[in-house]
A protein has these predicted regions:
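C-terminal and inter-domain tail/linker signature
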Residues: 2-183
C-alpha cells in the first residue's frame, strides 16, 4: 500500500480507513491518552510530501509536515499535556466526522474546566484531511473558532495567530519548561 509504487486502495476500503482514522483521533483525545503519549497517528499514514495548513497555527502558508520541528504525535502530546495543566479535564465533548472517498472532515468541540477558577472554557476545531488513492494523508488543514484565543491565553499565556512552523510549539515548550516538564 505504497503510493510511490502505484498500488491503490479500493473505494470502500478507503472510506472505511478514513472512518478508522477519524475515530482513532477522536477516541485518543476522549480517553485523554494523548497527553500521556498515546498516538492516534499510528492509524494515519502520511505521504512524504504531506502539507499542513492552518490560518491560526501557520499563518497564510502551508508547510510540509516534515518541516515542523516536532513530529505530529509529539506535538499533539505537548499540546494536550500543556492544556491539561490548567484544564485537567480538557477533552472533546462533541466529536463528529464525515468520511469520503478523498479524505474526511472532523468537527470537535473541545472543553475543560479551569482548575483555578472553575470556569468552563472551550472552542471548536474543524479539520479537513485529504488523502491519496492509497489512504495516505497528503494535506491536513485545521481551522478553529474565535473562542480559541481566550482559551490559549489561559492555557499557555499567549495566543495566535502564530506563523511558520515553530511559533506554536515553542510556546508549548516554554509553558512545559515553566512547570519543569518535558515530553
Amino acid at each position: 500500500m505504497d503510493g510511490r509504487k502505484g498500488s491503490t486502495v479500493n473505494l470502500e476500503d478507503r472510506i472505511a480507513l478514513h472512518n478508522r482514522m477519524a475515530r482513532a483521533y477522536g477516541d485518543a483525545y476522549l480517553r485523554q491518552g494523548v497527553q500521556d503519549g498515546e498516538k492516534f497517528v499510528d492509524v494515519w499514514k502520511f505521504h512524504p510530501d504531506c502539507m499542513y495548513a492552518s490560518p491560526y497555527f501557520t499563518g497564510d502558508e502551508a508547510f510540509k509536515l516534515s518541516e515542523f520541528p516536532e513530529e505530529s504525535a509529539r506535538a499533539s502530546t505537548m499540546e494536550a499535556k500543556v492544556y491539561s495543566l490548567r484544564f485537567p479535564d480538557w477533552k472533546p465533548v462533541d466529536f463528529k466526522h464525515w468520511p469520503a472517498d478523498n479524505g474526511f472532515v472532523m468537527k470537535t468541540r473541545w472543553q475543560g474546566t479551569n482548575k483555578d477558577t472553575g470556569t468552563v472554557m472551550g472552542f471548536y476545531s474543524y479539520s479537513f484531511i485529504d488523502t491519496d488513492d492509497n489512504g495516505e494523508v497528503v494535506r491536513w488543514e485545521t481551522h478553529i473558532n474565535s473562542e480559541y484565543s481566550d482559551f490559549l491565553d489561559v492555557a499557555i499565556g499567549v495566543h495566535g495567530p502564530f506563523h511558520g512552523t515553530h511559533e506554536y510549539t515553542d510556546a508549548l515548550d516554554r509553558r512545559l519548561a515553566e512547570e519543569g516538564l518535558t515530553v
